[in-house]
Amino acid sequence: MSRSNNANAPTPSNRRRNLSLVRGRRLTYSPPDAASAQRASPPRSAPRAAPRRVHAVGDPGAPLRASYALPNGVYNLHGDAHFNPPEEDDDILFVDTAAEQARQRAVNLHEAVNRHERLRRELGERMTRSPTLLNYSPSYSPTSPRSRSPDLIMPEDLQPAREQPLAPFNDSDDDERLLEQVMLESAEAPQLPQAPPAPQVDVSVLCHICSCTFTDIQNYNSNFVTSTECNHAVCFKCYVSIVFGKESYKCSICNRTTISCRAYNRDGYVELSTMSTVRDSQAIKRHWAQLSDSNMPHSNEMTTIQELQAELAELRAATARAHHDVNMARSDSQLLRQQLDVKEAELAHESNARLKLQKQNETLSANNLSLQHQLNTQVIESRVKMEQFKRQHDEFMEKFKLSLS
């Protein structure tokens, strides 16, 4: 009973053992007559439904707006992406992507179980239609101790626990392939969605000896070496300084001594121990020369980058000066425009004053002409009166003279 349960239990070890026995073991059969030796063509397994291809239209990160089920696959429309509308006989689905994937996984699992049960029924019917006796080879006889080992699976072990034992079946390559297909179908497991990778977090770690800070990715890598005795960690350069010229490592925190230390990464750890020490003050120079040749960017590129950066700084400074000059010119132009407006206002005021003075001058000129005309008239009248007075005076004097004589 325990062997039957182990054979039917879907554990990885049992599946591997079953497949190895099915591939490696060869069963020989003796048909009773030639008529029964003629084989019928083995039934073909039902064709599997080809999975529909899912096409994403637009940005996959955008919300799902519509889903079109077409003969060549399913088109998921995301966001505001444009998609030609399907024909009238096409199905338009508005579904949730996660729920649709879960439903598809359940349908695939149900179809796999149905195929498995159908193949088992077909195998049982074939066994029932052609009852023959099994002839085991000597090394696999039922009475052999090896055949009773828990690693050997008998034909009755392949049946479900509640079914009757099936009759032995005839030998053929088709039967073995059918049995192997049944075992492979039973070994298939539903595909589960893979978990997303853990986010990488940069963490700053301090060395207590040199007080240097290193930035490592948490749970991914480490620049520190750990003692196997005390689990106190130091940076790699401090570890090299401590073990230089020594066969053991002495922790500077708890003074424990150990021969090996550990360096960790995401895959595990590496045991480190001192093999040999060579004192050579020129070795570090040669090492840095190799680094300069192979592990550093080209000096010409760095020089070009520096020159371009300096030129960029000069251009930025020139641009700033040009902007300043433009701003100053704009200020001067605005000031000159204001002065021009003031001068134009003063000119307009002076023009108005000149017009007023011109009018006053014209008025005064007219008055002057009138006064001059009056003066001329008075002068003429005075001259006439003077001549008349002179003539009268002359006449009076003559009369006076005549009167005196």
From Swiss-Prot:
Annotated Low complexity bias? 30-49, 136-147
Q: Does the keyword Zinc-finger apply?
A: yes
Name the coiled-coil region(s): none
- For bias type Polar residues, the affected ranges are 1-12
* Alphabetical UniProt keywords: Activator, DNA-binding, Early protein, Host nucleus, Host-virus interaction, Metal-binding, Modulation of host ubiquitin pathway by viral E3 ligase, Modulation of host ubiquitin pathway by virus, Transcription, Transcription regulation, Transferase, Ubl conjugation, Ubl conjugation pathway, Zinc, Zinc-finger
* Amino acid composition bias (Basic residues), ranges on this chain: 14-26
> Which subcellular locations apply to this protein?
Host nucleus
Listed GO molecular functions? DNA binding; transferase activity; zinc ion binding
Q: Where is this region: Disordered?
A: 1-60, 125-153
InterPro entries per record: Znf_RING, Znf_RING_CS
A GO cellular component term found in this entry reads: host cell nucleus
Q: Broadest EC class?
A: transferase
Provide the reaction this enzyme catalyses: S-ubiquitinyl-[E2 ubiquitin-conjugating enzyme]-L-cysteine + [acceptor protein]-L-lysine = [E2 ubiquitin-conjugating enzyme]-L-cysteine + N(6)-ubiquitinyl-[acceptor protein]-L-lysine
Enzyme nomenclature, EC number:
2.3.2.27
| Gene Ontology biological process | symbiont-mediated perturbation of host ubiquitin-like protein modification
Relate the protein's function as given in its record: RING-finger E3 ubiquitin ligase that plays an important regulatory role during the initial stages of infection. Migrates to specific nuclear foci early in infection supposely to prepare the sites for viral replication by targeting and ubiquitinating host proteins.
What's the family?
Belongs to the alphabaculovirus IE2 protein family.
Subunit relationships: Homooligomer.
What is the protein's given name?
A: E3 ubiquitin-protein ligase IE2
Q: Encoded by which gene?
A: IE2
